[in-house]
């Protein structure tokens, strides 16, 4: 049974509805899937129903923005029964993410007459385009040629994740466990592009001390060296070994990256604990 446990719907920044995600997964021959939208679980009800109707094995998930030392990282939470406290953490993280766009426009409106916070707050976009409000607003107001180029503007104006009150990894893991779920580090290759494997292992050991449950070892941009490092660490410490292609639908960046099912991994090649 082929597995892909990292994909997004239009409830965060993907371009597909939850039902369309499940239908595409079935067409691609996947058997075990999860929608892990950024800081929201709005897709869960539709996703669960679609999986049941189409006979797909599934696990409910969410991708949380977190702080890990000096890094901004993502945690994938799976198989949890959300309680009031964890729901509040998810909601707060979503608010922090949205606030980044508000703060960017507050800065930029001082330099440009044709944009304003009031204009931004009243702005809407077609969520089927994927992405998120801030980058679509910048594109529609003429600041970028391509929607994704808006990310650079956030950086140029120093609107960084590290400036916002996202939960720490330790806090997130604690609440995921209270809810009976599993906490998995998403796409380490995005944080450790220029790191040695020794540096990676050092951070993994810190995560282990925080009771992380697994690592997304198989991911489109991972090098063979990093993949092997992740797998070995998980095997050595009895952690989950997961796979995710991070499909955002039409927002997927390149032909061979971030396409649903682009990494072919059978359930028997992984180590899953749900």
Q: Model-found features: residue ranges?
A:
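Hydrophobic, aromatic-enriched interface-forming segments
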Residues: 111-173
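Mid-domain alpha/beta scaffold segments of enzyme catalytic cores
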Residues: 20, 31, 38-103, 107, ...
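Charged catalytic cores and adjacent phosphate/nucleic-acid-binding surfaces used
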Residues: 1-9, 15-28, 41-83, 171-185, ...
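A generic structural signal for short
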Residues: 9-11, 35-36, 92-93, 122-123, ...
């Amino acid at each position: 049974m082929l597995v892909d446990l990292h994909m997004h719907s239009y409830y965060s920044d993907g371009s597909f509805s939850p039902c369309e995600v499940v239908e595409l997964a079935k067409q691609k021959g996947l058997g075990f899937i999860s929608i892990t939208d950024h800081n929201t679980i709005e897709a869960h009800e539709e996703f669960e129903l679609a999986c049941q109707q189409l006979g797909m094995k599934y696990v409910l998930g969410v991708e949380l923005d977190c702080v890990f030392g000096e890094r901004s990282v993502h945690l994938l939470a799976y198989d949890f029964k959300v309680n009031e406290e964890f729901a509040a953490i998810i909601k707060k993280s979503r608010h922090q993410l949205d606030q980044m766009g508000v703060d960017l426009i507050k800065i930029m409106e001082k330099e440009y007459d044709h944009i304003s916070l009031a204009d931004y707050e009243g702005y809407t976009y077609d969520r089927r385009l994927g992405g998120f409000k801030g980058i679509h607003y910048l594109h529609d107001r003429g600041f970028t040629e391509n929607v994704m180029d808006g990310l650079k503007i956030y950086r140029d104006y120093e609107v960084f994740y590290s400036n916002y009150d996202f939960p720490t990894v330790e806090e997130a893991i604690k609440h995921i466990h209270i809810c009976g779920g599993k906490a998995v580090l998403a796409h380490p290759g995005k944080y450790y592009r220029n790191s040695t494997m020794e540096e990676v292992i050092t951070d993994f050991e810190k995560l282990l001390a925080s009771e992380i449950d697994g690592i997304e070892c198989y991911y489109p941009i991972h090098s063979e060296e990093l993949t092997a490092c992740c797998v070995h660490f998980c095997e050595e410490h009895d952690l989950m070994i997961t796979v995710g292609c991070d499909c955002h639908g039409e927002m997927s960046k390149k032909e061979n990256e971030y396409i649903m099912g682009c990494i072919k991994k059978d359930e028997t090649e992984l180590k899953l604990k749900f």
